[in-house]
Amino acid sequence: MAKGLSLFERRRQRVRTTLRAKGNHRPRLSVHRSGQHIYAQVIDDDQRRTVVAASTLEKAVRDKSGATVAAAAETGKRLAERASAAGITKVVFDRGGFLFHGRVKALADAAREGGLEF
């Protein structure tokens, strides 16, 4: 890279550094957003494995709506249900380099309403 990191990559590094400092060995709720879909997963970094995951690619969500805020909220709700079934209540929210706005915020709010604490 001739010029260094892009703004997105610098923001992602800054968020991850903060998570490592404040994480206290909690599982990490990682969010990835594309133009068509949103993906979320709860990752246990100590064991290096994904505990639960949800996305708008799932048939039940995909049939209802596409890349909308409502679809992101439904994904957050499903993720919270699966996490509570796996015994996870407290997580650290990893938004990656994405701004906390729109679909990312809708997913986070729905996950909080579903019982996840962050």
Curated annotation (Swiss-Prot):
Listed InterPro entries: Ribosomal_uL18_bac-type, Ribosomal_uL18_bac/euk
Keyword terms, alphabetized: Ribonucleoprotein, Ribosomal protein, RNA-binding, rRNA-binding
A biological-process GO annotation: translation
GO cellular component: cytoplasm; ribonucleoprotein complex; ribosome
Entry's Gene Ontology molecular function annotations: 5S rRNA binding; structural constituent of ribosome
Domain of life assignment: Bacteria
Protein name, UniProt field: Large ribosomal subunit protein uL18
Similarity field: Belongs to the universal ribosomal protein uL18 family.
Complex formation: Part of the 50S ribosomal subunit; part of the 5S rRNA/L5/L18/L25 subcomplex. Contacts the 5S and 23S rRNAs.
Function: This is one of the proteins that bind and probably mediate the attachment of the 5S RNA into the large ribosomal subunit, where it forms part of the central protuberance.
Pfam families assigned: Ribosomal_L18p
